Amino acid sequence: MYKFWGKVQTHNKRGKKLGFPTANIALHQDIPEGIYISKTKVNRQIYGSVTFIGIAKTFGETRFHAETYILDFNKNIYGKWISVKLIKKIRANEKFNSVSELVEQMKQDAKMARKFFAY
């Protein structure tokens, strides 16, 4: 699989508004679009996470980027360096008909990751 790192950037804080605060990182390598179960390293600690790679089609964006939702994590890490290791692709990137449909899928993605990490 893939591994990448970068400084957490402020974007539009949409993930937080949807109940899934994400660490946004600019990508500097070619990684296939999709949603992945991942491990994220922050300040020498490793956390289970779900990572989105691609273009946020539901919101009509054109920017290719990475967003990582770190499970059960609520610290402010804007401007901090993190590394993300993709473990398993769980689905393709897709455009949802509504934001609520996307949120329901995100809940399922997080549930799958929790099961994978057994917590």
Residue ranges and their predicted role:
Residues 2-119:
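Phosphate/ribose-recognition catalytic cores of enzymes acting on nucleotide-derived substrates
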